[in-house]
Regions:
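Cofactor-centric catalytic regions
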Residues: 1-52, 60, 81-84, 91-93, ...
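The feature captures the short pre-catalytic strand/loop hairpin that immediately precedes
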Residues: 57-67
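A short glycine-threonine-serine/GTX helix/turn-capping micro-motif
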Residues: 66-78, 221
């Protein structure tokens, strides 16, 4: 959280097309530089297709405690200013605030104010979902008001490492380099269990340090699950390949003739032979005679993260 002073000017023509926008954001950093000006200046206009736009951020140092990221640092500050002004513009045009946003929404191919050209993205879909939702059409009672606002965050990829090991009793231990700041361990366990076709209760997720796992970049809500899920998925798929190899040794058939389904190695069709499926537990019990411990690790520098969009409807009653 950061104290702030925001100034936003947005123009639109009589056809309700946004023509220009300019935002200036003063964010307090505390005793040392590092206010989240990128989040405020970079995210505030991201949902919109504006031909002329400029944002500027000031990193203001003050005699107070240093600020630090909580969630989407700076973005809510910038969005609050811009979204309030958009409501005022829509009111001046006698237009529904959501319809005004939809008319000016960024789409695939839009050149974003903060730089990139958008690929497939979902901002329009959030607006359409709100417009078709019962909440939007519900009548307001006395002293009630309804507000709308949209938001954006960049998201990120980066380096992540993971190790997946099968224990002797057929359970699974996953080690990653990311502390859990919002439920990522549960998500990693579910991803691993789904790939292996086993109950999630059989998967344990450990947080390794630099002495036990490969390098993993900082843990932020906008990258941790995107990056760690990809690396855990690859590690788990490698483990499945090893399990199929072990089954091929037991059955004395080619690994390519084996499929992994619902936590079991099975012959991939009648031509592969008639064999009773081998469960993960059974393969783990035979790990030593078929080749030794079963496990795999993977490291990746994840790319391809795309931004996320959201639109909210909120009612307020004043007594």
């Amino acid at each position: 959280p950061s104290a702030s002073n925001s100034k936003d000017t947005t123009g639109a023509n009589n056809d309700a097309n946004m023509t220009a926008a300019q935002g200036t954001f003063y964010l307090q950093a505390g005793a040392f530089p590092g206010a989240p000006i990128r989040g405020a200046a970079g995210c505030c206009l991201a949902p919109y297709d504006i031909p002329n736009a400029h944002t500027f951020g000031y990193d203001v140092v003050s005699n107070r405690s240093k600020v630090a990221a909580y969630r989407a640092p700076g973005a809510p500050i910038g969005a609050y200013a811009v979204e309030c002004v958009l409501d005022e513009v829509a009111e001046a045009l006698k237009m529904c605030p959501l319809e005004f946003r939809l008319k000016n929404a960024a789409k695939e191919g839009t050149k974003a104010v903060h730089g990139p050209t958008y690929p497939v993205m979902g901002y329009v879909e959030t607006l359409e979902a709100c417009l078709s939702h019962p909440h939007y059409k519900a009548p307001l009672k006395k002293l009630q008001g309804r507000g709308y606002a949209s938001g954006f965050w960049f998201n990120a990829g980066g380096e992540s490492s993971a190790q997946v090991n099968i224990t002797e009793d057929g359970n699974v231990v996953v080690t990653t380099g990311h502390p859990d700041i919002g439920g990522s361990r549960a998500s990693i366990a579910n991803i691993t269990a789904e790939l292996l076709g086993i109950n999630v209760n059989r998967v344990s997720v450990l947080i390794g340090d630099t002495a036990t796992i490969g390098f993993s970049n900082l843990t932020g809500g906008s990258r941790v699950l995107f990056a760690s899920a990809l690396v855990v998925t690859e590690s788990t798929n490698q483990v499945i390949d090893i399990l199929k190899d072990r089954a091929s040794k037991i059955w004395n058939i080619d690994k390519e003739a084996i499929e992994w389904e619902n936590g079991e190695a099975r012959p991939a069709g009648d031509n592969a032979g008639k064999f009773k499926p081998l469960t993960l537990v059974e393969l783990a019990e035979q790990a030593t005679p078929t080749g030794g411990p079963i496990g795999a690790g993977h490291q990746v520098n994840t790319v391809g993260a795309e931004g996320g969009f959201a639109t909210h409807i909120c009612d307020v009653e004043v007594d």
